[in-house]
Amino acid sequence: MKKVLKIDYKQYPGKELNKINFEIDKNQKPIISIITPYYNSQKYIEETANSILNQTFPYWEWVIVDDGSPDKEAQEKLKEIEKMDSRIRVLHKENGGTAAARDYGIEKSDERTKYIMFLDSDDLIEKTYLECCYWTLETNPKASWAYTDTINFDGKEFLWRKWYNPDWELDENILTVTAMIKKDDLKEVGCFGIHEKKSI
């Protein structure tokens, strides 16, 4: 039986774009590269964008990898999203699947960034997400990655499910969907390439 979490749906991350109340140092290099695969994903991408732009940690770049979307509306939405902020970049490639799109995003990410964070085009993050993951990794140097719990929603309500299964670790590891990972460590293990046909 599903347990419905009692949250005001109007307040979920990304519902609105909030005003940032601090100055951003234009000379500061990006520290985090957010990688988002995109394939005809225009339905939720604007809310995903808002949840990124609302972050309390401002030193990021957002690399959206269009994985060969054929839909014209999807392409137009990407153009709109890219104009929202100078830290947003849209890349285009032939369709090759989610894993290949993520690897392409990693390859094309700013060489100065220290961390890679994966965020799918229909996912939202709380406004302190980047800040919390960043400081968790900075203060735990032996850790390679950080992630949080998730709340699912179906477009109308939030749903809480205990759906993790350790048997999924190798073929369908859901913990990486919004994880932040040290870029050097990720590259050392070959990113997603070797598991491309099985990855989510």
Where on the chain are the PLM-derived regions?
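Short beta-strand-to-loop acidic/aromatic patch adjacent to the donor-nucleotide binding site
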Residues: 112-124
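Glycine-rich, basic loop-to-helix element that forms the pyrophosphate-binding segment
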Residues: 93-111
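Conserved donor NDP-sugar-binding/catalytic core segment of glycosyltransferases
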Residues: 128-159
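Conserved nucleotide-sugar donor-binding catalytic segment
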Residues: 161-200
